[in-house]
Amino acid sequence: MLLFEKVGVENTEKALELALSSAKERGLDVVIATTGGGTVPVVLELAKKLGYEGKIVAVTHAFGSREKGKNILEPEKMQEFRDKGVTVVTAAHALSGAERGLSKKFSGIYPVEIVANTLKMLGQGTKVCVEIAMMALDSGAIDYGKQIIAVGGSGRGADTVCRLTPEYTSDLMGTKIHEILCKPSLEE
């Protein structure tokens, strides 16, 4: 496992190289997190450079997550990515979604949020990898029961890559993390 010195966007290119190389070697789909779309052009460029011809799925926030009726990822960018062969998934966060609404209203914490925060003990990106993999599976963008390479981050960019077999959110504890290829150190 490669351990980056710190979290952040400066790890993006190396994380994506690891993700695509591993996916190519193993014949796996790649699922990446994207908020505003900045990581997608980088992964497409590196995929071409490295000869990765497999499926790329970009998972972004649900509509209304920041502003009602809108998505953070602009519709033009979504279409541009689709035109380049990327499957774009917009969905509620698998490890918060409706539970976050309950915890805000009733000032508590609920089981799925506990799972999310437990995964964050390995870093924000590890939580994101598990979450986007389940979101992609729930949407039908990836095949059930197959390993994938998931790429997450801690804010902007990518800094965590996991090889995992996701489960549907209705059976989230069945998700298996087989390998963490890279992640940032959590040293302060």
Predicted regions: what is each one?
Residues 1-188:
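Conserved mixed alpha/beta catalytic, RNA-binding, or beta-rich assembly cores of soluble enzyme
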